[in-house]
């Protein structure tokens, strides 16, 4: 989380959604699981291909990690919805607002299979579907405090 991201967001609910997403990464231990997976794939490929195939090992390992990364992003999105549902204050699909804005600005030019993140359209749909299942999409937490926070940055 950094000041540029806070300035990019439109409201407190979006901020809560993004924070929930980042908390989910920590809670679900995505970074440590990613590192374990990455080093495991590299070692396996090195053993199979021999020591002189470093470039091939690096490329294959990197491509293999993209799917894991997208899965972790999708999982963090879902947990963000669940965390916000537990607050009974914020609309639990707050993170979707961030992706709606990103999609409008064309920030999904990379094909999903080559990206570390799912495309914004998929993320919006998944977040809103989860929110509908939990019945927590239409809560309002409008606050002038968020505008004050943004202007102080």
State where each predicted segment sits:
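A Zn2+-metalloprotease active-site environment signal
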Residues: 1-153
